[in-house]
From Swiss-Prot:
It comes from Mus musculus (Mouse). GTP binds at D217, A218, G219, K220, S221, T222, N353, K354, M355, D356, S395, G396, L397. Keywords: Cell cycle, Cytoplasm, GTP-binding, Hydrolase, Nonsense-mediated mRNA decay, Nucleotide-binding, Protein biosynthesis. GTPase component of the eRF1-eRF3-GTP ternary complex, a ternary complex that mediates translation termination in response to the termination codons UAA, UAG and UGA. GSPT2/ERF3B mediates ETF1/ERF1 delivery to stop codons: The eRF1-eRF3-GTP complex binds to a stop codon in the ribosomal A-site. GTP hydrolysis by GSPT2/ERF3B induces a conformational change that leads to its dissociation, permitting ETF1/ERF1 to accommodate fully in the A-site. It catalyses: GTP + H2O = GDP + phosphate + H(+). Residues 214-221 are annotated as: G1. Residues 353-356 are annotated as: G4. The gene is Gspt2. Belongs to the TRAFAC class translation factor GTPase superfamily. Classic translation factor GTPase family. ERF3 subfamily. This is Eukaryotic peptide chain release factor GTP-binding subunit ERF3B.
Length: 632
């Protein structure tokens, strides 16, 4: 910019260069340097006062500090293309001061109050121009606070609005206020839709828990993996990856089981340790697979899985030698079937697996042989052969008779496994019952999260509940059923519930979530009826064992033997026995080491049946008859 002949002198202030338009300043020829300097100083002082007045009229030095609001609508700066301008004070002043009105040609310096046309290269942001420019700049958050950088990271929705009008500039009025609100509302709706919830009007499939039980290496995990593949829960590429990895470890036939045995130790040894979980759906039902361990060392884990099940699938190996090993006294076939019945499983499907083995070759004679040996034992355990048990042949490795009828066994005319599950009658569950949620596990994740199966009642988000036996009042912050968030759950569903009001360290497996108006019973002493299943020596008062009741595991002592019960007539002996032995039924009094939650079998069967184990064996099964109040 030409400053006249005195080009060596520096300007007095940053305004001076801008305010001196070409030709407006004295040329310097014929004017005394002192007079020229005085005129420049006076003009600069006038401009400085005018600018100070403009600032003082717009800025409030006593204003409260800016506090960001996380729930406020997203800030859209006025100088971005297509953004909305702040409303003008009055309609008349807007006509005179709005940016983008009829202005002078570019390059001509205007006085304060005159409109300024923006540059064609981009939005003009300067301290000069009309008073409305100052108003616009000061009404937005100050640049030094970093608001401009935040505003540049606008959402995709607002970018689309900006890109739709590329010709918009600082002088444009921008979209009306209503359109900005619509964009904000659309954005909020998109955010809300991220939480998966089931519409109230949509029909909800019945939830069924299926536990796979049986002797070790019978093929439980392989059948579970095959079901997941056939129902589309595991894709072919994943299975091919498992097959390659299994082949590298010389475990070619184990690859299907890896869909459920995710632990590296389980994959290396080929033995399930923890209860694996998986989900699959049919046309009518939603199923949860509970893959229980078959090894005798992990029977307590199997009991925990069976306690959550609605029906059990007993997997039997038809291979010569394997069936006999599993069904003999030391095998787990007998114990698993008995424990499933004790845990409350009413329906049993017996899968005769490995029918494709060369020693079997889909032989109907071998199938009938296994069936004839199993029926008497299952009947003794308590299952009705006609109503509660269903047999079917299959091959977990090839998938034969799992989803579709197999051509290898034309002698079997029944439904394949998955269609048969879908055809089962619905379980009658009442949502009006008292809330009972036995805790299976817990962990920390943005609060305290508990896992369990809702046995009775219904739970909704925001509900106030009580954790027994500690009587902690808690609030339900969130509910997840099968990895989907929901606001309401009915009985039979496997849940993850985020709680408020209790720490993770204050919860143990076996605790019960109840409603405040209907708490479950708790105590240490109770009378029971037990059946001695297997014990070499006699059992006397003072005998200690491990009690498994719903999801609770607690040390227990038999403090007294009250009477013997005749198996056939059900009559009780009039005298107290001094001991009981194998195959006898008795009424006894038990006392646990700590307080536990329980109910009588008559009032709530699922929380009133139990198992006694000792030295890795199931000693007895029984039911709770009466709760004995503690003496003060």
């Amino acid at each position: 910019m030409d400053l006249g002949s005195s080009s060596d002198s520096a300007p007095d202030c940053w305004d001076q260069v801008d305010m001196e338009a070409p030709g407006s300043a004295p040329s310097g020829d014929g004017i005394a340097p002192a007079a020229m300097a005085a005129a420049e100083a006076a003009e600069a002082e006038a401009q400085r006062k005018h600018l100070s007045l403009a600032f003082s009229s717009q800025l409030n030095i006593h204003a409260k500090p800016f506090v960001p609001s996380v729930s406020a609508a997203e800030f859209v700066p006025s100088f971005l293309p297509g953004s909305a301008q702040p409303p003008a004070p009055t309609a008349s002043s807007c006509d005179e001061t709005c940016i983008g009105g009829a202005g002078e040609p570019e390059g001509k310096r205007m006085e304060w109050g005159a409109p300024v046309e923006p540059s064609k290269d981009g939005p003009l942001v300067s301290w000069e121009g009309s008073s409305s420019v100052v108003t616009m700049e000061l009404s937005e958050p100050v640049v030094e606070n970093g608001e401009v950088e935040m505003a540049l990271e606008e959402s995709w929705e607002l970018k689309e609005v900006s890109e739709a009008k590329p010709e918009a500039s600082l002088g444009d009025a921008g979209p009306p206020e209503e359109s900005v609100k619509e964009v904000m509302e659309e954005k909020e709706e998109v955010r809300k839709s991220k939480s998966v919830s089931i519409p109230s009007g949509a029909p909800k499939k019945e939830h069924v828990n299926v536990v796979f039980i049986g002797h070790v290496d019978a093929g439980k995990s392989t059948i579970g993996g095959q079901i997941m593949f056939l129902t589309g829960m595991v894709d072919r590429r994943t299975l091919e990856k498992y097959e390659r990895e299994a082949k590298e470890k010389n475990r070619e036939t184990w690859y299907l089981s890896w869909a459920l045995d995710t632990n590296q130790e389980e994959r290396d040894k080929g033995k399930t340790v923890e209860v694996g979980r998986a989900y699959f759906e049919t046309e009518k039902k939603h199923f949860t697979i509970l893959d229980a361990p078959g090894h005798k060392s992990f029977v307590p884990n199997m009991i925990g899985g069976a306690s959550q099940a609605d029906l059990a699938v007993l997997v039997i190996s038809a291979r010569k030698g394997e069936f006999e090993t599993g069904f003999e006294k030391g095998g787990q076939t007998r114990e698993h079937a008995m424990l499933a019945k004790t845990a409350g499983v009413k329906y049993l499907i017996v899968l005769i697996n490995k029918m494709d083995d060369p020693t079997v070759d889909w032989s109907s004679e071998r199938y009938e042989e296994c069936k004839e040996k199993l029926v008497p034992f299952l009947k003794k355990v308590g299952f009705s052969p006609k109503k509660d048990i269903h047999f079917m042949p299959c091959s977990g490795l090839t998938g034969a008779n799992i989803k579709e009828q197999s051509d290898f066994c034309p002698w079997y005319t029944g439904l394949p496994f998955i269609p048969y599950l879908d055809s089962l009658p619905n379980f009658n569950r009442s949502i009006d019952g008292p809330i009972r949620l036995p805790i299976v596990d817990k962990y920390k994740d943005m609060g305290t999260v508990v896992l369990g199966k809702l046995e009775s009642g219904s739970i909704f988000k925001g509900q106030q509940l009580v954790m027994m036996p500690n009587k902690h009042s808690v609030e339900v912050l969130g509910i997840v059923s099968d990895d989907a968030e929901t606001d309401f759950v009915a009985p039979g569903e496997n849940l993850k519930i985020r709680l408020k009001g209790i720490e993770e360290e204050e919860i143990l497996p076996g605790f019960i979530l109840c409603e405040p108006s209907n708490l479950c019973h708790s105590g240490r002493t109770f009378d029971v009826q037990i059946v001695i299943i297997e014990h070499k020596s006699i059992i006397c008062p003072g005998y200690n064992a491990v009690l498994h009741i719903h999801t609770c595991i607690e040390e227990v002592e038999i403090t007294a033997l009250i009477s013997l019960v005749d198996k056939k007539s059900g009559e009780k002996s009039k005298t107290r026995p001094r001991f009981v032995k194998q195959d006898q039924v008795c009424i006894a009094r038990l006392r646990t080491a700590g307080t536990i939650c329980l109910e009588t079998f008559k009032d709530f069967p699922q929380m009133g049946r139990f198992t006694l184990r000792d030295e890795g064996k199931t000693i007895a099964i029984g039911k709770v008859l009466k709760l004995v109040p503690e003496k003060d």
